[in-house]
Amino acid sequence: MERGINTKCLHLEEEEGCCNNYGSISFPIYQTATYEHPAVGQSTGFDYSRLQNPTREHLEKIVATLENGIDALAFSTGMAAITLVMELFKPGDHLIIDADLYGGSIRLFDNVSSKNGIHFSRIDCWKENVESYVNENTKAIYIETPTNPMMNVTDIAALAEITKRHNLLLIVDNTFLSPYFQNPLELGADIVVHSGTKFLGGHNDTLAGFLVTNRADISEKLRFLIKTTGSGLAPFDSWLILRGIKTLGIRMEQAQKNAFKIAEWLKTKSAVTRVIYPGLPDHPGYEIMKKQARGFGSMLTFQLESKEFALSVLEKVRMIKFAESLGGVETLITYPTTQTHADVPKKIRERNGITEATLRLSVGIEDAQDLLDEFEKVFAETEEELYGGKKS
């Protein structure tokens, strides 16, 4: 019988049995660099922690199970994972990438991968004729869904039909929804990317990245690359992510409930010109989300009427933290222009809809009313400061 996802977050069925690891309920941290060999040509299965480590291996099995993949690889950061993916390609290869991506991914593609001879077509995969951009050198399509920060939603299954028709890889960054709400491999993706720092870890206390696949040939290539480049996740960080995953479902559900309430509240404010949350029926990707995901997540973006209003909000929040990153238990508000997308050329930012009045919100698990009370206070103070009285 198939176990539920909350159970999968806690228990790895293949390792169940009485008193494994001396009966420890919490999986041990194998804080070691190397391992003793019983004799020449014999091994315990572990030789050197750059190659593999029991704590990291246990985490990888959990993540692979959650994404319904055959293998998962844990990296020191999300960007380390994406960097390694790019090692699958050679000079002259062509990739189609979503126009709206995390700024760090854009920086990698524009300033590192391009210099290594890889060519990119940057398009809106959620609305353009993707197939028309495929050429004889195209090797993969790379997307986020929802995208960061504009929350565009792409039909993964529809895109997978194109990649299968042309023998391309489909690489999907699933960070914003986590495996709790969405499983791209089941929809036809070949590789799933995660910044484990975010929802999987969930506590803003460690960095991690993951690649998950359901193809043995890809797994073999990625395993060789991670062992060769030395970008695997350390034992203690692996344990922190394991601990975070245990409460993934509880956190995702609570944060999503809060996100719905905040999105609805923002829509009532005259100073807010646009609320972008895929859980709202007016979002262009709402129906696709209902089809391919089990939830809408807790990430939202909103546009304010002016840069001055946006900066004032950022300066006045207290319980809500003005900080980069996302997916933790605390609510974080981010200014893409100077933070996550600071290295993205202004022309590209504006083309994607990111302005100096754009704010991104990662909703946490606080009591929703406390979050709303803080926003009410911050908006009122900003309106008093800018307009001399309440506006919305």
Predicted feature residues:
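N-terminal "arm"/small-domain region of PLP-dependent enzymes with the aminotransferase-like
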Residues: 1-53, 59-62
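Glycine-rich beta-alpha junction loops
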Residues: 14-16, 31-37, 176, 198, ...
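Conserved PLP-enzyme active-site core in the AAT-like
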Residues: 17-18, 72-271, 276, 287, ...
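PLP-dependent enzyme catalytic core of the Aspartate aminotransferase-like
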Residues: 103, 110, 119-121, 251, ...
